[in-house]
Amino acid sequence: MDRFVWTSGLLEINETLVIQQRGVRVYDGEEKIKFDAGTLLLSTHRLIWRDQKNNECCMAIPLSQIVFIEEQAAGIGKSAKIVVHLHPAPSNKEPGPFQSSKNSYIRLSFKEHGQIEFYRRLSEEMTQRRWETVPVSQSLQTNKGPQPGRVRAVGIVGIERKLEEKRKETDKNISEAFEDLSKLMIKAKEMVELSKSIANKIKEKQGDVTEDETIRFKSYLLSMGIANPVTRETYGSGTQYHMQLAKQLAGILQAPLEERGGIMSLTEVYCLVNRARGMELLSPEDLVNACKMLEALKLPIRLRVFDSGVMVIELQTHKEEEMVASALETVSERGSLTSEEFAKLVGMSVLLAKERLLLAEKMGHLCRDDSVEGLRFYPNLFMTQN
């Protein structure tokens, strides 16, 4: 912790913000300290931590002070962490929260998730080392110059050499892991192509594809699930997470909506999406928050709330007038219908069937008879006859 210096939190000239994440706690090695809830910012030159309650409490550490970083998985009751190993503090270091520390590393605990994306971006900055190619103000340059304390300390060079060897070995292991991952991704691409081929067969129904085979194919496709579900671990718990989730929902729901007449209840959507996500289950709150962003992001589907409070997802092309006209035509052919009877005829849930009939009634095309036998809808003759 003695590597941190106090800062205003403002970016210097030529310094660019890369990513930020709320709900991050800082540990001095294994020790808990007072910096327990803040926003962690990564720039091209520094790691900056700002207290969420007191914005004047802001400290930073140059990326040039970092030796290497590693991930620490979450445990029972414990958040995932990023461990940052640091060079010794330079003798000309500016004032900070600690004058000295026995630890050569800090831990960053991500209470609100987002550590996967933050670790990836930090690793990229450590590889690119943009702080060397694009210098900023003199206040940051001081930490990159010669460090007299390190020259005088016997054995520091040997420790650094060992750390460098460990970093190279880690890089080698990561490279081998990515080679295996690349092979897996090639197989995944083959599976995607296969699923597209099956989907086209279902759509066109060419050859000898029977109705039973169609149902079986669809169940196979659904069981394959979502290849890369959006999670809090990847995008954190804020607006960015719900935006990415909304985009993924639009991708997986468009085809089922087209098959169901352009509209589905939010309950159906919840079951369908969680079945496809497998172990990465989605909470009802996150689903609603993501759906509220669909229209703002100009996606092909949208959230609609009926007067009764029932929430549905529908295609942007789904027109209310056509829906009401279809309901009126069906009721007129039968003389009168209950919501249960209407649901069987048009092949939708009773909940959605009732909402469609109520909408037609609201627009004056239907009228009701609410008796002990239940709610029954009739064509509104005042609208059709003189």
From Swiss-Prot:
GO cellular component terms attached to this protein's record: cytosol; ESCRT II complex; late endosome; late endosome membrane; lysosome; nucleus
Domain of life: Eukaryota
SUPFAM superfamilies for this protein: PH domain-like, Winged helix' DNA-binding domain
Membrane-crossing segments per the record: none
UniProt cross-references to InterPro entries, sorted A to Z: GLUE_dom (IPR021648), PH-like_dom_sf (IPR011993), Snf8/Vps36 (IPR040608), Vps36 (IPR037855), WH-like_DNA-bd_sf (IPR036388), WH_DNA-bd_sf (IPR036390)
PROSITE patterns hit by this protein: GLUE (PS51495)
MF-aspect GO terms: phosphatidylinositol-3-phosphate binding; ubiquitin binding
Keywords tagged on the record: Coiled coil, Cytoplasm, Endosome, Lipid-binding, Membrane, Nucleus, Protein transport, Transcription, Transcription regulation, Transport
Descriptive protein name: Vacuolar protein-sorting-associated protein 36
Source organism of the structure: Mus musculus (Mouse)
Encoding gene, per UniProt annotation: Vps36
